Amino acid sequence: NSAHPCCDPVTCQPKKGEHCISGPCCRNCKFLNSGTVCKRAVGDDMDDYCSGITTDCPRNPYKGKD
């Protein structure tokens, strides 16, 4: 069983100097840049973009209500 390369095995938190462990806006232990598409549009929808400060893929604020 190998440890995740971004995770401190003792604390289960990102290693020093790393931003994240996993998520749609995390790659190679770093947050993806602001404006990186994290969810492509389907139909009349609009793309969702990473914020650059979190691993979440926030919903595009200009989308209509579900």
From Swiss-Prot:
It is found in: Secreted. PROSITE patterns: DISINTEGRIN_1, DISINTEGRIN_2. Keywords: Cell adhesion impairing toxin, Disulfide bond, Hemostasis impairing toxin, Platelet aggregation inhibiting toxin, Secreted, Toxin. A motif (Cell attachment site) lies at residues 42-44. InterPro entries: Disintegrin_CS (IPR018358), Disintegrin_dom (IPR001762), Disintegrin_dom_sf (IPR036436). Disulfide bonds join C6-C29, C20-C26, C25-C50, C38-C57. Expressed by the venom gland. SUPFAM superfamilies: Blood coagulation inhibitor (disintegrin) (SSF57552). Its main location: secreted. One of its GO terms (molecular function) is toxin activity. When it dimerizes either with EO4A or EO5A, there is no inhibition on alpha-1/beta-1 (ITGA1/ITGB1), alpha-2/beta-1 (ITGA2/ITGB1) and alpha-6/beta-1 (ITGA6/ITGB1). Belongs to the disintegrin family. Dimeric disintegrin subfamily. Heterodimer with EO4A or EO5A; disulfide-linked. This is Disintegrin EO5B. It comes from Echis ocellatus. The lineage of its organism: Eukaryota, Metazoa, Chordata, Craniata, Vertebrata.
